[in-house]
């Protein structure tokens, strides 16, 4: 008999091996996925510990005399600038420009390992500079957003989001820099940030291929939340608006600092704004760059203290304008959101001048009317704005018969500005309203747009006729300029912004491997390499002469072809010293030619003595003359 599987006491006995069910075989094509989500953070944490202990570090970075050790693989993965330095050039020691703050760089270097960045509100500009040099655009975008939010929060008391519900973050009051307290703030729910940079396909050598991780859900925990609170005082008599004192949503941790993820936690639009308490906040640094000033409105920067007041802006001769060095007026751009209409100018109420000339003193041409100041007209050329002015060339802001600026600023379209970009191309603008009655003075707010001005030929402005259009049409391309530099200029492509940043910092990242000459642009290095290879790819079809540079070849080809045509077309049919056939005649322009000592001359010689009309040179009879023979012979002197 088979032994019972149960013991007399009822306990289960182990089955014999032969009776155990066999394991189910896995299909041959099956793939088993195993995820270890904690490995990524643990790996970076381990690398950061190695960096802090100086272990396995293979690259050193010097900033203003201080040296930092790091891992080249981490640097190349986190910064396009370091990618070019350590991967393409194989450098083991990198010296960064002295414009960077060593403390800010140390924090940014740690954020490459930890994914977190902690900064004081007054040091945001330093971090913006470091991010611009290292081309870490997620830091540049975040610092720009914080500066923009701080500026807008200083001009409003409470801004609530209209598209999403708000989430209240309770926190204790934090003392501000001027003795006030910051009330608990409200943070709007933030959409995950989707950037168009992630879809760009660029070569690693262009320093523009890098794009940070884009979408990350906003965490409401105390470690991932931050609230920007601002002061309500609008007085800027001692250096500009106050910057908000940040509040971190955890009691007793990182008071007075901003704790933010290196990934994009918030979208650039800033859906939510914090409720503010009057008198709170830290003052914004006077050296803040123009990145804090968003785009698309002309603004007026006032003069420094003790500077002579500028004369009224009237139309002057261009030569005289160059000599007016004491006016020191600067035009920049400002975002069309957070703007209020009214009158404004560069003279404070009460006549007290500003202490410093900084970006914190920027005032738009359309400031609130309570400033009690006059508007300033920056564009005095009536020729530029004729299509929009029905009052003729003399119509302007100073027209005594027209309405005051405060009366028409809210009801009339803006006055267009016609600035020039860096290459000298004209940037067209259009008014915010599609029509304007003749004789009415325009407003002062200008919006950029690649459209054809009304009444102006598109051909005369150097743009295709099909590129123009009404506001909002296909011709408006300024909306695509989403890549901002910290100077305030916007670009439609990230590669253009990278080249612009290199120009700012005078960086020359491309050096010749033969002679070590450095260049700002990669195509400059490519052209320079021709001097070492001796390659001359351009050959003249007339004289078979070869050229290395295309512009030299094009200049030579034009002259060579003209000489060839003159030599072939100027052959005469008979001997004689007279001019050959086809030679222009005229007593005023006909050069004199003395008769040859030889009995006769060919038609070639006769024609060669008289160049074409656009090359003819007049010689008085008493001057020794030289005949030029373009058919291949030498010149004969008489």
From Swiss-Prot:
It comes from Mus musculus. May be involved in transcriptional regulation. PROSITE patterns: BTB (PS50097), ZINC_FINGER_C2H2_1 (PS00028), ZINC_FINGER_C2H2_2 (PS50157). The lineage of its organism: Eukaryota, Metazoa, Chordata, Craniata, Vertebrata. It is found in: Nucleus. This is Zinc finger and BTB domain-containing protein 22. The gene is Zbtb22. The modification Phosphoserine is found at residue 203. Keywords: DNA-binding, Metal-binding, Nucleus, Phosphoprotein, Repeat, Transcription, Transcription regulation, Zinc, Zinc-finger. Residues 57-121 form the BTB domain. Pfam families: BTB, zf-C2H2. Residues 171-223, 229-248, 335-354, 367-451, 564-638 are annotated as: Disordered. GO terms for molecular function: sequence-specific double-stranded DNA binding; zinc ion binding.
């Amino acid at each position: 008999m088979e032994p019972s599987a149960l013991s007399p006491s009822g306990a289960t006995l182990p089955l014999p091996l032969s009776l155990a069910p066999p394991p189910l075989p896995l299909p041959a094509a099956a793939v088993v996925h195993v995820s270890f989500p904690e490995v990524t953070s643990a790996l970076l944490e381990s690398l950061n510990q190695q960096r802090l202990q100086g272990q396995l570090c293979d690259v050193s970075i010097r900033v203003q005399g201080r040296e930092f050790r790091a891992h080249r693989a981490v640097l190349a993965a986190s910064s396009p600038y370091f990618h070019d330095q350590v991967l393409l050039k194989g450098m083991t020691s990198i010296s960064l420009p002295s414009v960077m703050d060593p403390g800010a760089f140390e924090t940014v270097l740690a954020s490459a390992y930890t994914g977190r960045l902690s900064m004081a509100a007054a040091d945001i500009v330093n971090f913006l500079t470091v991010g611009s040099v290292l081309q870490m655009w997620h830091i540049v975008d975040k610092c720009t957003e914080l500066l923009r939010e701080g500026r807008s929060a200083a001009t409003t008391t409470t801004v609530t989001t209209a598209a999403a519900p708000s989430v209240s973050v309770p926190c204790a009051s934090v003392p501000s820099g001027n003795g006030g307290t910051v009330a608990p703030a409200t943070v709007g729910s933030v959409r995950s940030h989707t950037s168009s940079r992630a879809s760009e396909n660029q070569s690693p050598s262009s320093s523009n291929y890098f794009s940070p991780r884009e979408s990350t859900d906003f965490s409401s925990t105390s470690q991932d939340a931050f609230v920007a609170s601002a002061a309500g005082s609008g007085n800027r008599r001692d250096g500009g608006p106050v910057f908000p004192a940040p509040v971190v949503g955890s009691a007793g941790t990182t008071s007075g600092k901003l704790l933010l993820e290196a990934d994009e936690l918030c979208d650039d639009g800033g859906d939510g704004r914090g409720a503010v308490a009057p008198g709170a906040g830290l003052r914004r640094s006077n050296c803040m760059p123009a990145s804090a000033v968003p785009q698309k409105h002309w603004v007026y920067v006032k003069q420094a203290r003790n500077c002579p007041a500028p004369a009224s802006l009237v139309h002057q001769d261009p030569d005289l304008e160059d000599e007016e060095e004491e006016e020191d007026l600067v035009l920049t751009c400002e975002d069309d959101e957070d703007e209020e209409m009214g009158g404004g100018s560069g003279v404070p109420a009460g006549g007290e001048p500003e202490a410093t000339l900084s970006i914190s003193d920027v005032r738009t041409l359309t400031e609130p009317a309570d400033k009690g100041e006059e508007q300033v007209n920056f564009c005095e050329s009536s020729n530029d704005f004729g299509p929009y002015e029905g009052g003729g060339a003399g119509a302007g802001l100073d027209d005594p018969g027209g309405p005051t600026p405060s009366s028409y600023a809210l009801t009339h379209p803006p006055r267009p500005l016609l600035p020039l970009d860096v290459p000298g191309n004209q940037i067209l603008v259009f008014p915010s309203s599609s029509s304007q009655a003749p004789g009415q003075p325009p407003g002062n707010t200008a919006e950029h747009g690649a459209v054809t001005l009304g009444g102006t030929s598109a051909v005369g402005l150097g743009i295709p006729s099909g590129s123009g259009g009404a506001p909002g049409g296909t011709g408006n391309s300024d909306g695509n300029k989403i890549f901002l530099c910290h100077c305030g200029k916007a670009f439609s492509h990230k590669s253009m912004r990278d080249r612009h940043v290199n120009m700012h910092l005078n960086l020359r990242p491309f050096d010749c491997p033969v002679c070590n000459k450095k260049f700002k642009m990669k195509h400059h290095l490519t052209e320079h390499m021709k001097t070492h290879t001796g390659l001359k790819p351009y050959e003249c079809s007339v004289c078979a002469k070869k050229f290395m540079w295309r512009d030299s070849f094009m200049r030579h080809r034009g002259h060579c072809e003209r000489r060839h045509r003159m030599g072939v077309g100027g052959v005469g049919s008979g001997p004689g010293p007279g001019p050959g056939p086809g030679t222009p005649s005229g007593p005023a322009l006909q050069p004199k030619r003395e008769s040859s000592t030889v009995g006769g001359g060919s038609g070639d010689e006769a024609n060669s003595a008289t160049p074409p009309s656009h090359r003819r040179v007049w010689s008085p009879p008493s001057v020794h003359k030289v005949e030029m023979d373009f058919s291949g012979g030498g010149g004969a002197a008489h």
